[in-house]
Every structure is written in C-alpha cells, then in structure tokens.
C-alpha cells in the first residue's frame, strides 16, 4: 500500500475493532523507569523512651517510666498476688506473651498506657483477648528475634526452639501451637546464648546442666528431648539459674550428659524463699 491516506485509514479501522473487542479499561498502570524504585516504608512515629515492666503472678502488667518509678516505687498488688517478672525495655519494643494453652500473643509495649506503681496495671488476659481461664506462663522481649526459647515439661523433657519461629510478617496477634501439648508446661526460658541452669524435680532432686546439651529445633511444637530422669510419682517442678538457687556445692548437682537423675537436694541447699526466675 503506497497511499499514506489508505494506511492511516486501515490503522484507524483496526484500532476501532480492537476498542470494540476489548472495551474493558486498563486495570494496570504503566510504570516508567523513573517510577520503578521501591518507595520507602513510612517511618514509625510511635514515641520511643525507656520503660520498666512489672508482671504479677496473676497476669497484671504495668509499664512505668523511670521518672514515675523514682517518685514512687512501692508496687501495688491484689490480695494474694505478688511480683513475678520484671524488665527494662523501650516503648516501641515487641512483646511475646506465652500462656498455658500452647498459645503466644504478640503485641507492642506502645499498646499499653504508662501507669504508676500505685495501680494494679493491665489485666493481660483481658487486654489481649485470651480464652476464658487462660493464664500467662511468661513473657519475652524478642528484640531482633535472635536466641531461643526453652520449654520445660512436667514429664522431664525440654524443647529448645529458635525464637525466629515466632516471628511473623503479618499483624497476626495470636499464634496457636506455640509449644508441645504432650505434657503440661512447668517453666519457660528465653536465652540469647547457652548457659547453666538448675532443674528441680518434686522428689526433690536437682540437675545442673548447660543448655548447649539441648539440640535446637525450628518446629514450635517439638516434644523436645529427655532432660531429667524421673522416678514414678515425681515430676519436673521448676527451673532456676544456679547463682540464684542458694546452693553452695554446685558441683554435686552438675551433669555432663542428659538425660540424668540429678542429686538429692541437701537440706542446707534448700531454700523455699528463693523465687524462680522463670
């Protein structure tokens, strides 16, 4: 075809036919090279400042600023309640709350109001929307999610799980299957690196071992490995750090391999007033 007019007419006809056939408007946007760079994520404008956290045995949490704590440090608790755990943290920090129902609740400290020592604090089960009768077993400030959790079960087993297994990309608040349900959970511990721990049974016996003996798992619901060999009718009771036990002869209770029975707790090494760190 040599005529420019005829060429233009042919193109016009073809475009008209295409328009009739594909009448739906464009659903995507043309992106040019200068637009292809990923836009920076919006900056977190949540105020960040140091805070002190106080958790009671019955699950009440207080977030108190250092200034407020200096003015009044005597903590108020309900009758029959008392101090369980406390940390120093920052307002933007994440918080993981583990319960007795194999669940983990993820929240941020900025979701909690600053309070004073003279109040009871937030009731965590109510604040986080826990199931009826669900109780707090422990809390963790995950930071960059390095390190690992260790779960200690009534049957003498312990499960060492990478903390990164609890990191989520979504805003999911509740994680189910946070740990194994094969035996009741007696204690949990968050460690950045391996160290010695003292494991107590109800006999009472004590076994002091290094957590390096526990193999690390990536599956949250792993049953763990046998740690404490138990006689019938006895169970794993609690876990402490050796320096907090009041035991004078630590060598008596040390084990080089697992599982092990530990040694009977001497009267002079028993201290009912010692608080578990877990």
Question: At which residue positions do the language-model features occur?
Answer:
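C-terminal interaction appendages of subunits in large macromolecular complexes
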Residues: 1-278
């Amino acid at each position: 075809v040599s005529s420019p007019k005829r060429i233009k007419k042919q193109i016009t006809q073809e475009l008209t036919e295409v328009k009739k056939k594909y009448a739906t408007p464009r659903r995507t946007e043309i992106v040019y090279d200068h637009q292809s760079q990923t836009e920076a994520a919006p900056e977190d404008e949540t105020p960040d400042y140091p805070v002190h956290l106080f958790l009671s045995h019955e699950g009440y949490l207080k977030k108190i600023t250092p200034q407020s704590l200096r003015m009044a440090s005597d903590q108020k608790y309900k009758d029959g309640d008392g101090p369980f755990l406390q940390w120093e943290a920052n307002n933007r920090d994440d918080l993981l709350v583990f319960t007795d129902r194999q669940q983990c609740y993820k929240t941020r400290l900025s979701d909690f109001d600053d309070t004073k020592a003279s109040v009871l604090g937030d009731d965590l089960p109510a604040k986080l929307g826990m199931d009826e009768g669900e109780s707090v077993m422990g809390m963790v400030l995950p930071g960059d999610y390095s390190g690992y959790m260790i779960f200690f079960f009534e049957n003498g087993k312990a499960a060492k799980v990478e903390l990164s297994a609890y990191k989520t990309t979504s805003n999911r608040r509740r994680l189910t299957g946070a740990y194994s349900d094969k035996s009741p959970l007696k204690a949990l511990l968050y460690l950045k690196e391996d160290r010695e721990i003292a494991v107590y049974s109800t006999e009472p016996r004590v076994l002091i071992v290094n957590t390096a003996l526990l193999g690390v798992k990536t599956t949250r619901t792993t049953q763990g490995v046998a740690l404490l060999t138990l006689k019938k009718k006895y169970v794993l009771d609690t876990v402490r750090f050796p320096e907090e036990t009041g035991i004078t002869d630590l060598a008596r209770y040390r084990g080089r391999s697992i599982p092990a029975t530990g040694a009977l707790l001497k009267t002079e090494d028993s201290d009912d007033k010692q608080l578990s760190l877990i």
